[in-house]
Amino acid sequence: MDFHGTTVLCVKRNDSVIIASDGQVTMGNTVLKHNAKKIRKLYNGQVLTGFAGSTADAFTLFERFEGKLETYKGNLLRAAVELAKDWRTDKILRRLEALLIVADKEHILIISGNGDVIEPEDQVAAIGSGGPFAFAAAKALYDNTELPAKEIAIKAMEIASKICIYTNNIIITEELS
């Protein structure tokens, strides 16, 4: 059975970095949970993370990523690249189905199981089924308003929840400021 239902958005503006997700977990066409937490802080609260995909796979990747952060003393880029290398080459990790967004005060990165570590050109990134909708809304708000990162993230997530059936309007946020 396929699990769907995640939208994770990260916005950086001025000295604030915010990550937001919806709370819906769906199996097939059934909503199983409305308030799941798909985001967390790692490395003594200095790194934000969020996932789209299988929950068990995501937690495995969170643990691995946190280990890489410890090994590389909080160097987000190095930890992300090393995780992506492991994810791509390890026979067991290779089967994990998830995408991660990770961010610190300087960088926002998307990490995939294909070995990709992508730093968006803009200060906005999104993953998951509602990711394209949240990204478009956040980008429009970022480019055309002076709203703070948190307001942009919340408004964009609300818009995504009205378009994507796998995204709800119970929005959970974490912030670095």
UniProtKB/Swiss-Prot annotation:
CDD domains linked: protease_HslV
Major site of localization recorded for this protein: cytoplasm
GO cellular component: cytoplasm; HslUV protease complex; proteasome core complex
Pfam families listed in its UniProt record: Proteasome
One MF term in the entry's GO annotations: threonine-type endopeptidase activity
Enzyme Commission number(s) of this protein: 3.4.25.2
Subcellular location: Cytoplasm
Spans traversing the lipid bilayer: none
Active site positions: 6
Activity control, per UniProt: Allosterically activated by HslU binding.
SUPFAM superfamilies, alphabetized: N-terminal nucleophile aminohydrolases (Ntn hydrolases)
Residues that, per the record, bind Na(+): 161, 164, 167
The protein's role, per its UniProt record: Protease subunit of a proteasome-like degradation complex believed to be a general protein degrading machinery.
Assembly and binders: A double ring-shaped homohexamer of HslV is capped on each side by a ring-shaped HslU homohexamer. The assembly of the HslU/HslV complex is dependent on binding of ATP.
Family: Belongs to the peptidase T1B family. HslV subfamily.
Name of the protein described by the UniProt record: ATP-dependent protease subunit HslV
Higher taxonomy: Bacteria, Pseudomonadati, Nitrospirota, Thermodesulfovibrionia, Thermodesulfovibrionales
